[in-house]
C-alpha cells in the first residue's frame, strides 16, 4: 500500500483543537454515538473498533454504553490527546495503519469509520482493500459503519477557494477536484492572529456517491446495507444528504 506520510501529521494539535479535539465537536460526537448505538443494536460488552479514532471523541462516547472499545489512529498527536482525555477503563488506544489490520481479524462486533475517514489511499484498489480489511475485522454477523461526505452534495456547492475567521483564527483552503479520478485535493492553512503561529496541511481524499459506496460495500463482503441521510435519522437523499451513514453486516 502507498505510504501516505501526510496522513500522520494532518491533525496536529492546532488542527485538532479547532476541529476533532474541540468541545463543540465532542458534544456533536455524543449525539452521533447515541444514534449509532441504537442503529447497531449491539449487546452489552460488545467489542467496537473505532478506526481511525482521531482524538477519541467517539470512542469515549461508545464507552459510556459499557462497550469494549479499541481506538486506532495513525497520528501520534491524536493518540496522545485521546489517552489524556480517556476516563474509561474499557477504552484502549494504539497507533495503527488502516491498511494493516490483520491482527484484528474476526475480533469485533462493530467497526466504525466516521467523519469522512475513508478514501485516503492513492488508488481505488487500495481503498477497496482497506474496506475489505475493515470488514474482515468483524466477527460473523458483525456490522461496519461508514460515515463519509456525499460527492453529489459536495459538487453542488463546491468552492475551489474559501476562507473563514473564527475568533482569533484564520483558515484558508484551496481545493481541486479531479473529475476523472474522483479525488479531491485540498491545501489548508490555519493561522492564529494573536500569536502568529500557523500550520499548513495537504489533504487528498477519494469522494464517493451513495450508489458507489453501496456497491463498494457489497463488493467487500457486506450484506443488508442500510443508509441514513444524517445522524438525525432522516432518509437518504442522494443529492442533498451531506454525510450519509452506511451500516453493513458481514456476510
Q: Whereabouts are the PLM-identified features?
A:
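Conserved class I S-adenosyl-L-methionine
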Residues: 1-46
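Class I SAM-dependent methyltransferase "Motif I" SAM/SAH-binding loop
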Residues: 52-56
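Class I SAM-dependent methyltransferase SAM/SAH-binding core
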Residues: 57-100
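A short acidic, Gly/Pro-enriched loop at the edge of an enzyme's catalytic core
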Residues: 102-110
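A short SAM/SAH-binding and catalytic strip from SAM-dependent methyltransferases
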Residues: 109-125
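A short glycine-rich, Lys/Arg-flanked "PGG" loop and its adjoining helix->strand segment in the class I
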Residues: 128-140
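SAM-dependent methyltransferase
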Residues: 145-216
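C-terminal lobe and adjacent flexible extensions of AdoMet/dcAdoMet transferase-like proteins
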Residues: 210-251
Amino acid at each position: 500500500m502507498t505510504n501516505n506520510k501526510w496522513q500522520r501529521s494532518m491533525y496536529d494539535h492546532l488542527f485538532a483543537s479547532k476541529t476533532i479535539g474541540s468541545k463543540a465537536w465532542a458534544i456533536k460526537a455524543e449525539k452521533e454515538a447515541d444514534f449509532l448505538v441504537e442503529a447497531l443494536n449491539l449487546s452489552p460488552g460488545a467489542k467496537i473498533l473505532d478506526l481511525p479514532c482521531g482524538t477519541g471523541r467517539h470512542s469515549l462516547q461508545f464507552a459510556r454504553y459499557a462497550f469494549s472499545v479499541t481506538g486506532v489512529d495513525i497520528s501520534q498527536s491524536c493518540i496522545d490527546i485521546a489517552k489524556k482525555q480517556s476516563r474509561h477503563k474499557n477504552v484502549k488506544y494504539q497507533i495503527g495503519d488502516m491498511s494493516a489490520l490483520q491482527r484484528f481479524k474476526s475480533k469485533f462486533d462493530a467497526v466504525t469509520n466516521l467523519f469522512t475517514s475513508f478514501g485516503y489511499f492513492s488508488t481505488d484498489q487500495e481503498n477497496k482493500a482497506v474496506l475489505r480489511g475493515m470488514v474482515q475485522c468483524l466477527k460473523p454477523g458483525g456490522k461496519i459503519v461508514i460515515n463519509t461526505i456525499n460527492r453529489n452534495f459536495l459538487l453542488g456547492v463546491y468552492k475551489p477557494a474559501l476562507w473563514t475567521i473564527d475568533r482569533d483564527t484564520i483558515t484558508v483552503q484551496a481545493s481541486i477536484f479531479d473529475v476523472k479520478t474522483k479525488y479531491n485535493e485540498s491545501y489548508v492553512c490555519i493561522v492564529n492572529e494573536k500569536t502568529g503561529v500557523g500550520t499548513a496541511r495537504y489533504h487528498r481524499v477519494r469522494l464517493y456517491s451513495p450508489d458507489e459506496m453501496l456497491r463498494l460495500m457489497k463488493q467487500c463482503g457486506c450484506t443488508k446495507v442500510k443508509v441514513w441521510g444524517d445522524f438525525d435519522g432522516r432518509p437518504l437523499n442522494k443529492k442533498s444528504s451531506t454525510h450519509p451513514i452506511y451500516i453493513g453486516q458481514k456476510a
